[in-house]
Curated annotation (Swiss-Prot):
Domain topic, free-text comment: Consists of 3 domains; the N-terminus binds the ribosome, the middle domain has PPIase activity, while the C-terminus has intrinsic chaperone activity on its own.
Protein name: Trigger factor
Keywords of the record: Cell cycle, Cell division, Chaperone, Cytoplasm, Isomerase, Rotamase
One Gene Ontology term from the biological process aspect of the record: chaperone-mediated protein folding
EC number(s) stated in the UniProt entry for this protein: 5.2.1.8
Chief localisation class: cytoplasm
Pfam families hit by this protein: FKBP_C, Trigger_C, Trigger_N
């Protein structure tokens, strides 16, 4: 076998592989003999038909099979001998097999880039420092109360935080428009659901009041026909309600799985959940900064095949997330939606992979155990979850991969320029939610 390697462009390589005629002819004869033994030919006993007839009837089939086998086997040998790492499946272009002649084919594919991660000392990380304070806990308890709040009619002017029920008809230049009419519409004032100025016009009104709301749709409004248009809404306020928060009673506490109904137990459980969420958010913040710095310090070419594969993965995840379409009903989401995210994933994967290989990072058993225990605390029976992971090798391997990634992040962090900054609980959590 002879192999020549050509760099066509960027990461693309073209192998021209030549297989000696003797090897090809022997493979064709073997294939024809096998076909002769298994195929029925009229007038001849199995395996007794003349070679000329076998070639005439099965020659094309034998050549096709031999070509496939030669391309697969010799391509693998060629990339091993030339130390190439394909980033995707090759495009094969074979010449026709001719008796007594060498068989030649080309294989075109992309390789992974060759690089060494550098510039770790230039990465800057602002490490947020935060704790769950008593006021944070109180706010979270209030949030739980609001989630279980009820509404009661009041004979009062509508104000921030109140809920109103109203009818309205919208018009532009005296003409009603689609989507501008509603009856029995519920709106919590101050929630920011409506376009600017709409809620402000309701403030101070009482049930039974009829009035006109005059607003202008934003220039970036989602409906093209309404962008920047001035509109009037003929409105009537049907009902004004105020929010009634439940007291921290035994009954209320039991709604959250605290069988004793003890308020302090609820607070302790909520604080524990908040601390777990905060720890994860702090970790994510640091990790995101480390990866951003790693990418900025190391500009590398990306194999198009690897990016395309990542786009397909993201597309399938999106379809599952938004309804799990069956069969041919799935919409073809454009690749552009996922291009940037796919490129980042591939780039980060290559860079982290180099850090892991160069530093020979292996999963630390203590780190693996810590990750499993941390995940288990989110479940009702942590011990059962831990045992499940310990008995499931596939799940364990997934955790080991997480541990290796964490250890790589820690190594980069140890070389980076790190400063600390005290931040509030809400700020950390809100940033984490926005990033997700």
């Amino acid at each position: 076998m002879q192999v020549s390697v050509e760099t066509t462009q960027g990461l693309e390589r073209r192998l021209t592989i030549t297989v000696p005629a003797a090897t090809v002819d022997a493979a064709v004869r073997k294939e024809l003999n096998g076909l002769a033994k298994t195929r029925r030919i009229d007038g001849f006993r199995p395996g007794k038909a003349p070679v000329a007839i076998i070639k005439k009837m099965f020659g094309a089939m034998a050549h096709a099979r031999v070509a496939d086998e030669m391309m697969q086997n010799n391509f693998i040998k060629a990339i091993i001998e030339n130390k190439l790492s394909p980033a995707g499946a090759p495009t094969m272009d074979p010449k026709e097999i001719q008796e007594g002649q060498d068989f030649e084919f080309t294989a075109t594919f992309e390789v992974y880039p060759e690089f060494e991660v550098a510039g770790l000392e230039t990465i800057k990380v602002e490490k947020p420092v935060a704790t769950v304070k008593d006021e944070d806990l109180a706010n979270m308890i209030d949030t739980l109360r609001k989630q279980h709040a009820t509404w009661a009619d009041v004979d009062a002017a509508a104000a921030d935080g109140m809920r109103v029920t109203m009818d309205f008809i919208g018009s532009i230049d005296g003409e009603e428009f689609d989507g501008g009419k509603a009856e029995g519409f519920n709106l919590v004032l101050g929630a920011g659901r409506m376009i600017p100025g709409f809620e402000d016009a309701i403030m101070g009104k009482k049930a039974g009041d009829e009035f006109t709301i005059e607003v202008t749709f934003p220039a970036d409004y989602h409906a093209e026909n309404l962008k920047g248009k001035a509109a009037k809404f003929a409105s009537k306020l049907i009902k004004v309600e105020e929010q009634i928060l439940p007291e921290l009673t035994e009954e209320f506490v039991k709604r959250f799985g605290i069988e004793s109904g003890n308020v302090e137990e609820l607070k302790a459980e909520v604080r524990k959940n908040m601390e777990r969420e905060l720890a994860q958010a702090l970790k994510n913040s640091v990790k995101e900064q480390v990866l951003n710095g790693l990418v900025e310090a190391n500009q590398i070419d990306l194999p198009k095949a690897a990016v395309a594969q990542e786009i397909d993965t993201l597309r399938q995840q999106a379809l599952q997330r938004f309804g799990g379409f069956q069969g041919g009903n799935a919409p073809e989401l454009p690749a552009e939606l996922f291009q940037a995210q796919a490129e980042r994933r591939v780039r980060v994967g290559l860079l982290l992979g180099d850090v892991i290989r160069t530093n020979e990072i292996k999963a630390d058993d203590a780190r693996v155990t810590s990750i499993i225990e941390s995940m288990a605390t989110a479940y009702e029976d942590p011990k059962e979850v831990i045992e499940y992971y310990q008995k499931n090798e596939q799940m364990l391997n997934g955790v080991r991969n997480l541990a290796v990634e964490d250890q790589a992040i820690d190594l980069i962090l140890s070389k980076a320029q790190v400063t600390e900054k005290e931040v509030a609980f809400d700020e950390v959590i809100n940033k984490s939610g926005a990033a997700a």
